[in-house]
């Protein structure tokens, strides 16, 4: 007899470099705790980010820019992700890297604008009238065919719906009868009909029929409790980019050209300013009517020094437009040349006139104690057992080299411990792995010492 174990098919979450970040780790007063929500240290930067998230929530921050500046490995990307976690999934957060704007198919400014629109949400409130209940009767009424002949057409459908509160008889359009047939609605089914669109949805068989033995595997649902006729408010969250794309590429035409267009590989096309202007008009009309509200989100541009002078000039205009999100830049450069210029150098690789418009948040280097805490959190996230000695040693390595290098030694050290049959990662495992691999500084030193042996 063969017995097989059924393995779970749920997707295992891969541990990324910022999986441990769960939020900014602030208390009720907005002060940073020393270590909370996966973040350690950087108290002043975290408090500043906390104030910005509050401003975003109260919608007073749109069209402003923030720059996270600091040396590599001081948690700039982690802070931006923590802000996204704090804001929740209702506020759009669009991360991008500075080098993403360079494409052979579309302009740099188009990529920037696309991401700008992705970071602006629109919350549309819609009131739907719904008839819901168990079908008690379903009678199509026929009339003579106006075209002549012996055939008859359906003029209307009489349907009876029952809920726990009462019953109602409805006279429906013949087009709804087709929907009822498609859904295979019978007496005893629980359905709901949208009054505005005439959409019909069969939810299942009423559970009063559950005792009847039937060969078909039916899904039994309870009798609806409210009234037959109800008004439901449905809230939809879309971004402006979704609206742009939906209108830029209309789906389904019957002519041969659109058929061919659907078969061919879709080329990335630019969305024109005219189309965006039209969509903005419609959005403004919705906002004036109170049907929708604008939710300015966050656009996070990492490695902002990779943008060139043209992109920066475009950012000026984009930041000052009426519909603009909050832009968070991150850069680990000091004074460097602005890309696309010959000899203009500037702090963080950003032109001075744009630096004038941004609020700068500094991130400081971590102390050995903070590094130790971060490595401990990473070990917990990756599910590794590590001794105190090994943690302290990794903290020292992180201080001499970089935090990233110290964190990268964790998994190989745990693998070595497992090969040796140990459950806990000890100091000697870390030392052995550290001897096998080089960090950037020691590798550069070897290059300097042996520069004659390497090719130029």
Curated annotation (Swiss-Prot):
GO cellular component, one term: Ino80 complex
Disulfide bonding pattern of the chain: none
Localization in the cell: Nucleus; Dynein axonemal particle
Keywords: ATP-binding, Cytoplasm, DNA damage, DNA recombination, DNA repair, Helicase, Hydrolase, Nucleotide-binding, Nucleus, Transcription, Transcription regulation
Biological process terms in GO annotation: axonemal dynein complex assembly; box C/D snoRNP assembly; chromatin remodeling; DNA recombination; DNA repair; epithelial cilium movement involved in extracellular fluid movement; heart development; positive regulation of DNA-templated transcription
InterPro entries for this protein: AAA+_ATPase, P-loop_NTPase, RuvB-like, RuvB-like_C, RuvBL1/2_DNA/RNA_bd_dom, TIP49_P-loop
Residues that, per the record, bind ATP: 70-77
Record flagged with keyword Hydrolase: yes
EC number(s) from the headed UniProt entry: 3.6.4.12
Keyword presence, DNA damage: yes
Gene3D superfamilies per record: 1.10.8.60, P-loop containing nucleotide triphosphate hydrolases (3.40.50.300), RuvB-like helicase, domain II (2.40.50.360)
Matching Pfam families: TIP49 (PF06068), TIP49_C (PF17856)
Main subcellular location: nucleus
Reactions accelerated catalytically: ATP + H2O = ADP + phosphate + H(+)
Annotated GO MF terms: ATP binding; ATP hydrolysis activity; DNA helicase activity
Ranges where the record places region Disordered: 1-20
Family, similarity comment: Belongs to the RuvB family.
Function according to Swiss-Prot or TrEMBL: Has single-stranded DNA-stimulated ATPase and ATP-dependent DNA helicase (3' to 5') activity suggesting a role in nuclear processes such as recombination and transcription. Proposed core component of the chromatin remodeling Ino80 complex which exhibits DNA- and nucleosome-activated ATPase activity and catalyzes ATP-dependent nucleosome sliding. May act as a negative regulator of embryonic heart growth.
PANTHER family according to UniProt: RUVB-RELATED REPTIN AND PONTIN (PTHR11093)
Subunit structure: Forms homohexameric rings. Can form a dodecamer with ruvbl2 made of two stacked hexameric rings. Is a component of the RNA polymerase II holoenzyme complex. Component of the chromatin-remodeling Ino80 complex. Component of some MLL1/MLL complex.
Name of the protein this chain belongs to: RuvB-like 1
Originating species: Danio rerio (Zebrafish)
Underlying gene: ruvbl1
């Amino acid at each position: 007899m063969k017995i097989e174990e059924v393995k779970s098919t749920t997707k295992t979450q891969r541990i990324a470099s910022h999986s441990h970040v769960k939020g900014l780790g602030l208390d009720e007063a907005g002060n940073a705790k020393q270590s909370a929500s996966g973040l350690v240290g950087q108290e002043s930067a975290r408090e500043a980010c906390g104030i910005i998230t509050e401003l975003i929530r109260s919608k007073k921050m749109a069209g402003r820019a923030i720059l996270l500046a600091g040396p590599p490995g001081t948690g700039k990307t982690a802070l931006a992700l923590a802000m996204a976690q704090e804001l929740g999934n209702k506020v759009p957060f669009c991360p991008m890297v500075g080098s993403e704007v360079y494409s052979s198919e579309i302009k740099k400014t188009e990529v920037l604008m696309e991401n700008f629109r992705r970071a602006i949400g629109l919350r549309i409130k819609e009131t739907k009238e719904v008839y819901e209940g168990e079908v008690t009767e379903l009678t199509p009424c026929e009339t003579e065919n106006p075209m002549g002949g012996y055939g008859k057409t359906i003029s209307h459908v009489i349907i009876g719906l029952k809920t726990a509160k009462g019953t109602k008889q409805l006279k429906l359009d013949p087009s709804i009868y087709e929907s009822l047939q498609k859904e295979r609605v019978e007496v005893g089914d629980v359905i709901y009909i949208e009054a505005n669109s005439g959409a019909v949805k069969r939810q299942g068989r009423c559970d009063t029929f559950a005792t009847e033995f039937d060969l078909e595997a039916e899904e039994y649902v309870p009798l609806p409790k409210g009234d037959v006729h109800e008004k439901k408010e449905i809230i939809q969250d879309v971004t402006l980019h979704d609206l742009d794309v939906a209108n830029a590429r209309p789906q389904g035409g019957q002519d041969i050209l659109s058929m061919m267009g659907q078969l061919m590989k879709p080329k990335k096309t630019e969305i024109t300013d005219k189309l965006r202007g039209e969509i903005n008009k419609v959005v403004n009309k919705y906002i004036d009517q109170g049907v929708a509200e604008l939710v300015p989100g966050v656009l996070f541009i990492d490695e902002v020094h990779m943008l060139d002078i043209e992109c920066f000039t475009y950012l000026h205009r984009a930041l000052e437009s009426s519909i603009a999100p909050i832009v968070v830049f991150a850069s680990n450069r000091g004074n460097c040349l602005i890309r696309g210029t010959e000899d203009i150098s500037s702090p963080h690789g950003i032109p001075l006139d744009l630096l004038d418009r941004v609020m700068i948040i500094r991130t400081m280097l971590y102390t050995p104690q903070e590094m130790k805490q971060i490595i401990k959190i990473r070990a917990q996230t990756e599910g590794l057992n590590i001794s105190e000695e090994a943690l302290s040693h990794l903290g020292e390595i992180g201080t001499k080299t970089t935090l990233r290098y110290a964190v990268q030694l964790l998994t190989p050290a745990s693998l070595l411990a497992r090969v040796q049959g140990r459950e806990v990662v000890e100091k000697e495992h870390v030392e052995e792995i550290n001897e096998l691999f080089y960090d950037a500084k020691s590798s550069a030193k070897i290059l300097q010492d042996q520069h004659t042996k390497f090719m130029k």
